[in-house]
Structure formats: structure tokens, C-alpha cells
Amino acid sequence: MPRSLKKGPFVAYHLLKKIDKMNASGKKDVITTWSRTSTILPTMVGHTIAVYNGRQHVPIFISDQLVGHKLGEFVSTRTFKSHIKTDKKTKR
């Protein structure tokens, strides 16, 4: 279920504070965060945010198409390990 419109989107306070400070100064540094549940707002467009996936911080450049989504949607937490594809002759 989507979040109630009455409540508004969730954004971590520390992340919003860093974005506002960088917008005021005009800087474009990489912002590291662990908040995967934060919603991407229009004020974040143009910034690079490094989101933690459990092992490392993965940088995401925020563009117009990402507004309204969560930060965690673009950073996978699980690595896919496929099975080794071998020849049919070796299985016999």
C-alpha cells in the first residue's frame, strides 16, 4: 500500500539537511547514506548519493526520472550466483 498523502513522503532528516546545505552552497559532492527507505525528492536532482547495500556504498546519480522512487530500489542487496553451465556430455 502506498503512503498516505496526508503524511507526505518519508525522507531521513540528516539526508534532507545535507541536501539543503549543498543546494545553498552550490556544491555537488557525493553524499553517503544508509537510508534506503528515503524517497527521492525534486531537490535531490543533480546530486550523487552513495547508498549502502550491506557491503559497500553504491553511487547513484539522481535524475528527473528517479523522483518519487526510494533510494533502495536502485541498489541491489543480493548478488546473483548462477549455476555453472556445463556440457551435456559431462553430465552423462
Swiss-Prot record:
GO molecular-function terms, A-Z: rRNA binding; structural constituent of ribosome
Gene3D superfamilies the UniProt entry points to: 30s Ribosomal Protein S19, Chain A
Keywords assigned by UniProt, alphabetized: Chloroplast, Plastid, Ribonucleoprotein, Ribosomal protein, RNA-binding, rRNA-binding
Pfam families reported for this sequence: Ribosomal_S19 (PF00203)
PROSITE patterns: RIBOSOMAL_S19 (PS00323)
InterPro entries (alphabetical): Ribosomal_uS19, Ribosomal_uS19_bac-type, Ribosomal_uS19_CS, Ribosomal_uS19_SF
Entry GO terms, CC: chloroplast; mitochondrial small ribosomal subunit
Endpoints of the signal sequence: none
Chief subcellular location: plastid
Localization, UniProt: Plastid, Chloroplast
One GO BP annotation of this record: ribosomal small subunit assembly
Taxonomic superkingdom: Eukaryota
UniProt cross-references to SUPFAM superfamilies, sorted A to Z: Ribosomal protein S19
NCBIfam families from the UniProt entry: rpsS_bact
Function in brief: Protein S19 forms a complex with S13 that binds strongly to the 16S ribosomal RNA.
Family: Belongs to the universal ribosomal protein uS19 family.
Protein name according to UniProt: Small ribosomal subunit protein uS19c
